[in-house]
A protein has these predicted regions:
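Mature extracellular/passenger domains of Gram-negative fimbrial/pilin and adhesin proteins
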Residues: 2-6, 11, 35-189
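N-terminal signal peptide c-region/cleavage motif recognized by signal peptidases
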Residues: 31-33
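Residue-identity detector for glycine
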Residues: 13-15, 20
Length: 189
């Protein structure tokens, strides 16, 4: 499968621990250059900051939700094309992406627009199954009127929801938590 454009996303957490347990968690997203003849993908911001966590307040057996973060995804193509994409990353459980050994994140595409008009997203091999969540191994295609639609510009808000296990927060030394992957535009046929 030919990759039209690639967007690399790295979810990286850096924890600094002292007498009061705290962690600064940051997500980094950046784009990889592509040739002029290909579609171009960009994100609105390269860094998503999860702020400071206090492990003593958050630790336990339950997963800790680190919040929702949103960035804007834009695809610009020189010619009208069917937009289909996936996110390639390490699967945590088939439905979420791994974030280190003890965390995970979900990606949801919200408010998708093709050439400025609202569209739907569906599984590439089953257009009847509408979806806005990008799960491991899944490819979504842009639909208008129930069929794959062609356009030159696509945009959507990418919501990143991240969780970390309570046990992972309750550590006493510097800890690095990493996870990531990349968006790919793929042929829709």
């Amino acid at each position: 499968m030919k990759e039209l454009r690639q967007l690399v996303a790295k979810v990286c957490g850096i924890g600094r621990y002292s007498s009061g347990i705290s962690a600064a968690l940051v997500s980094f997203l950046w784009a990889v250059e592509a040739s002029a003849a290909q579609c171009r993908i960009s994100l609105s911001q390269p860094v998503v900051d999860y702020g400071l966590l206090r492990g003593a307040e958050q630790s336990g057996s339950q997963d800790v939700f680190l919040g929702k973060r949103t960035v804007r995804l834009n695809v610009v193509c020189p010619e009208a094309t069917v937009i289909a994409m996936r996110f390639q990353g390490v699967s945590a459980d088939g439905q979420r992406y791994a974030w280190g050994r003890h965390g995970y994140f979900n990606l949801t595409l919200e408010h998708p627009l093709l050439d400025g008009r609202p569209v739907e997203l569906a599984h590439v091999h089953n257009h009847a199954t509408r979806s806005t969540g990008l799960q491991p191994g899944q490819t979504l295609v842009v639909l208008a009127g129930g069929v794959p639609a062609t356009g030159r510009t696509f945009s959507a808000q990418v919501q990143v929801d991240t969780w970390l296990s309570g046990a992972a927060i309750a550590v006493r030394s510097k800890t690095v938590v990493e996870g990531g992957g990349h968006f790919e535009l793929v042929p829709a046929g």
